[in-house]
Amino acid sequence: MKELQEHELDHIEDDVYLLYLYTPFCGTCQLASKMLTVVKEMLPDVAFYQNNVNYSPTFAKAYQIESVPCFLLFKGGKMVERGYAFHSVSYLYELIKQKSSSASHL
């Protein structure tokens, strides 16, 4: 996953993308990152990015990030899913696949 800085977060141009938010010393975040790496390979039409929220306080506040790990899924410039529970690779795959191909929004 490509690491983005805070100033880049509002300028992503992909139609469908997932933004993974983490902190480096979070053990659960490390596991979630490995899961997303697998899912990324299975969903080539979805762009995957990551951001260390320690360096993005304005973004975290604007999107009301409550904890990490967290993912935000965007489609057509709008957030369509926010998740804190990563469950499993199959859960993430199905959720991202369904949300990225449907017209549903939060």
Swiss-Prot record:
It comes from the Bacteria. InterPro entries: Thioredoxin-like_sf, Thioredoxin_domain. SUPFAM superfamilies: Thioredoxin-like. Residues 1-101 form the Thioredoxin domain. One of its GO terms (cellular component) is cytosol. GO terms for molecular function: protein-disulfide reductase activity. Keywords: Disulfide bond, Redox-active center. This is Thioredoxin-like protein YusE. Disulfide bonds join 26-29. It comes from Bacillus subtilis (strain 168). It holds the Pfam family Thioredoxin. GO terms for biological process: cell redox homeostasis.
